[in-house]
Amino acid sequence: METANLVAIFVSCLLVSLTGYALYTSFGRPSEGLIDPFDNHED
């Protein structure tokens, strides 16, 4: 394969991995430790 194809595949895999990790952090088990500052704010 050409170098450009390998770089494109690598960047695509990296982007998909980062998106998956962000979704897991937002909605998976680690999200239980996250707090919403807007819920804690008293008007």
UniProtKB/Swiss-Prot annotation:
Keywords: Chloroplast, Membrane, Plastid, Thylakoid, Transmembrane, Transmembrane helix
Major localisation: plastid
InterPro entries in alphabetical order: PSII_PsbN
Coiled coil: none
Primary role: May play a role in photosystem I and II biogenesis.
Transmembrane feature ranges: 5-27
Pfam families named among the record's database cross-references: PsbN (PF02468)
Protein name: Protein PsbN
Membrane topology: Single-pass membrane protein
Top-level division of the source organism's lineage: Eukaryota
Cellular location(s): Plastid, Chloroplast thylakoid membrane
Recorded name of the encoding gene: psbN
GO CC entries: chloroplast thylakoid membrane
GO biological processes: photosynthesis
Cross-referenced HAMAP family: PSII_PsbN (MF_00293)
Family: Belongs to the PsbN family.
